[in-house]
């Protein structure tokens, strides 16, 4: 809880039924990757990757703005929670880049590509928390 990362914090809000409070306009765009896609990527690199090389893992097929993720989570929760914009002057902990693009070409040449769409991953995660 409250680990400061947008996905974990927003998901906790959604599961707890508390409003998502945006600390910025939410214009930053990220390429979230579902855990099974990330694990598959690690296994592919472990088995087929070049020794001592690095590979970017991200779902570059679906870059999404932070505010869009917040709205999707509100929708998943049946609109029981609201997305509230309360910009703070001190955004020192946030990345200043609107878009951080990761080139996934190298890992894709090994045969990896993301399989889980962001919406499906968010629904799966939400449902797994609700089922607990």
Regions found by a protein language model. Name each.
Residues 14-132:
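C-terminal substrate-binding subdomain of Rossmann-fold SDR/epimerase-dehydratase oxidoreductases
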């Amino acid at each position: 809880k409250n680990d400061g990362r947008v996905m974990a914090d927003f998901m906790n809000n959604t599961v707890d039924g508390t409003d998502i409070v945006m600390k910025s306009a939410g214009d930053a765009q990220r390429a979230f990757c579902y855990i099974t896609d990330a694990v598959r990527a690690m296994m592919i690199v472990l088995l087929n990757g070049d020794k001592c090389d690095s590979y970017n893992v991200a779902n570059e097929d679906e870059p999404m703005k932070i505010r869009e993720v917040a709205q999707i989570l509100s929708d998943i929760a049946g609109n029981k929670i609201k997305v509230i914009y309360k910009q703070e002057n001190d955004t020192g902990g946030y990345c200043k880049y609107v878009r951080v693009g990761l080139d996934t070409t190298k890992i894709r040449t090994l045969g990896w590509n993301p399989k889980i769409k962001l919406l499906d991953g968010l629904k799966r995660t939400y449902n797994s928390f609700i089922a607990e």
